[in-house]
Curated annotation (Swiss-Prot):
Keywords of the record: Ribonucleoprotein, Ribosomal protein, RNA-binding, rRNA-binding
One function term, GO molecular function aspect: structural constituent of ribosome
Name of the protein: Small ribosomal subunit protein uS5
Organism listed in the record: Rhizobium meliloti (strain 1021) (Ensifer meliloti)
Its job: With S4 and S12 plays an important role in translational accuracy.
Length: 189
């Protein structure tokens, strides 16, 4: 009975294959200073968004003395903290949602095919890594990238699949979809 070692070559190759499915975007990088007895010690803080472009996305924050190390730490943190977001037709959100974090507020709206990603800065990175192709987003309040990303994730966590909404309301999914079609909204799954 041969047991595999923890850091075996196969394990490393499997991890690299799993990581290759993710797309990462650097959202922000800051130079930070720690004041010590002899002066200031400089370091870097990075904010990274990671996603598989199929509905899973996460963000991470990493700090280190060198930029590449901070980015690596942030990327690892993002991969550990992924969330799943249901997408309509694999291209847009199911319904409009609000999110907030601190003084930052965001409004995310589903859009028709061909609209594209109409969103600024940090929110665009989240949607590109998530796999959303058509969305309209508006941010108000804080323009701090950390707050905007966290507010966007708050909104995405509130996103529900129509099947879940139907179950919550105690009605059939087909009834909910027929109401959607009769309201003039194109039905896509």
């Amino acid at each position: 009975m041969a047991q595999e070692r923890r850091g075996s070559r196969e394990d490393r190759q499997n991890r690299e294959e799993r990581d290759s499915e993710f797309v990462d975007k650097l959202v922000a990088i800051n130079r930070v200073a720690k004041v010590v007895k002899g002066g200031r010690r400089f370091g870097f803080a990075a904010l990274v968004v990671v996603g598989d472009q199929k509905g899973r996305v996460g963000f991470g924050h990493g700090k280190a003395r060198e930029v590449p190390e901070a980015i690596r730490k942030a990327t690892e943190a993002a991969k550990r903290d992924l969330i799943f977001v249901p997408l309509r037709g694999g291209r847009t959100l199911h319904h409009d949602v609000h999110g907030r974090h601190g003084a930052g507020k965001v409004l995310l709206r589903s859009a028709k095919p061909g609209t594209g990603i109409i969103a600024g800065g940090p929110m665009r990175a989240v949607f590109e890594t998530l796999g959303v192709h058509d969305v309209v987003a508006k941010s108000t309040g804080s323009s701090n990238p950390y707050n905007m990303v966290r507010a966007t994730f708050d909104a995405l966590k509130n996103q529900m699949h129509p099947k879940d909404i139907a179950a919550q309301r105690g009605m059939k999914y087909a009834t909910l979809q027929s109401r959607r079609v009769s309201a003039g909204v194109a039905s896509e799954e």
